[in-house]
Amino acid sequence: INDRESIADTFRKAFIIATTGRPGPVIIDIPKDLTDPNVKIDFDYKKNIKIRSYKIKTNEDENKIEEAAKILCSAKKPMIYSGGGVILSKASKELIKLTKLLNYPITNTLMGLGAYPSSDNQFLGMLGMHGTYEANMAMHDCDVLLAVGARFDDRVTGDTKQFCPKAKIIHIDIDPSSISKIIEVDHSLIGLSLIHISEPTRRPII
């Protein structure tokens, strides 16, 4: 912040950035002289604020969606792996809808617990070093893995060279920097609603 007139708008922008897309911290640097109690500050701000260079990216390329659907429908040993991003984006209903449509087994990370009902017979329990044997073995042996809102934490992956060694991996995430950051994936969809990928899976894939 370089002047007191921009304080209110800067804080508004910071809250927008912190709470949209992938939520996270925002640093605001306030010079000491602006904290002087004798300095009068107007905290009115514009209702509509445009943030230069900040835009949540989405990828709604129909060809990429169709390709992901083909990979999913060709699976012999599929697995769905959901993380905290599903909770943060309030996409649990979409996740349940897609999982039921595909009739595939599903596991959650610790941060993703609650995104899918634990009482359902398709749920294999939590994944990772503190997870269930069934979930970990199903992940290791799967031939297609759909990762949704997950960051491939080391408590889940363990040795990255041995993680899902036979699987084609599809990663859906709102943050482009998370794609292939830890685990190299075969197919990615950025910021895509699960509704988009569920529609092609309803149709016969030849």
Regions found by a protein language model. Give the residues of each.
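Anionic-ligand anchoring segments at beta-strand to alpha-helix junctions in alpha/beta enzyme folds, i.e.
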Residues: 60, 73-142
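Single conserved hydrophobic/aromatic residue that forms the stacking wall/gate
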Residues: 195-199, 203-206
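Glycine-rich beta-alpha junction loops
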Residues: 30-36, 84-86, 176
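Short internal beta-strands
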Residues: 29, 104-110, 170-173
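Short gly/pro/ser/thr-enriched loop/turn and capping motifs at secondary-structure boundaries
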Residues: 35, 112-117, 153-154, 176-181, ...
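Short acidic-hydrophobic, aromatic-tinged amphipathic segments that line or gate anion-handling sites
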Residues: 1-3, 126-128, 187-192
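Gly-rich Lys/Arg/Thr-decorated short loops/hinges at beta-loop-alpha junctions or inter-strand turns
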Residues: 41-53, 115-119
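Structural signature of the thiamine diphosphate
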Residues: 1-45, 68-71, 136-170
